[in-house]
Regions:
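Glycine-rich phosphate-binding loops that contact phosphosugars or nucleotide phosphates
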Residues: 44-163
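An N-terminal, well-structured beta->alpha segment
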Residues: 2-41
Length: 164
């Protein structure tokens, strides 16, 4: 690939990601306000949970919360099912991140988190998913396409999840 082709691919990636962000800005503002109110009006910490690429995004969200003075911790969805739930206090809000909304490990966590009376916020790429039905607030992170020319790498979806 020559430099001109590479520059065109880069421009296309930026364009697709920007388009997806603009589309999302029209559909989620009121839900973002609900989620922000929930987090802001809670005295404890926020737990952010994901797996795979969503887990990496969750870690970045935790870092941002901590930078702004909001206590937050990352919980790996698979590790949570194997003894890492000791971080919870009753009522700690939890943000569950899943592109598909059908991640088994996260779905298995929901009833356990309900026992902790944890309000659940989902940042979900499929608002018609099983996870979307189970959380209190859905932040719709769906994208019509990824910026990756092959459509297999989560590019637009991860950018949108960070923006939410």
């Amino acid at each position: 690939m020559n430099k001109t082709d590479l520059a065109n691919v880069a421009k296309q990636i930026f364009t697709v990601e920007a388009e997806e962000l603009i589309k999302a800005s029209a559909r989620i503002p009121s839900d973002v306000v609900k989620a922000a109110d929930l987090i802001q009006n809670h005295d404890g910490k926020v737990v952010v949970c994901g797996l795979g690429k969503s887990g990496l995004i969750a870690q970045k969200i935790v870092a941002t919360f901590c930078s702004t003075g909001t206590q937050a911790v990352f919980l790996h969805a698979a590790e949570a099912l194997h003894g890492d739930l000791g971080i919870y206090h009753p009522g700690d809000p939890t943000i569950l991140i899943s592109k598909s909304g059908s991640t088994d490990e996260i779905l298995r966590l929901v009833p356990i988190l309900r026992e902790f009376q944890s309000p659940l916020i989902g940042i979900i790429g499929n608002s018609n998913s099983r996870l979307a039905e189970k959380v209190d607030i859905v932040l719709d992170a769906s994208v019509s396409r990824e910026a990756d020319p092959l459509g297999i790498v989560p590019t637009s979806s991860t950018t949108l999840t960070l923006a939410v």
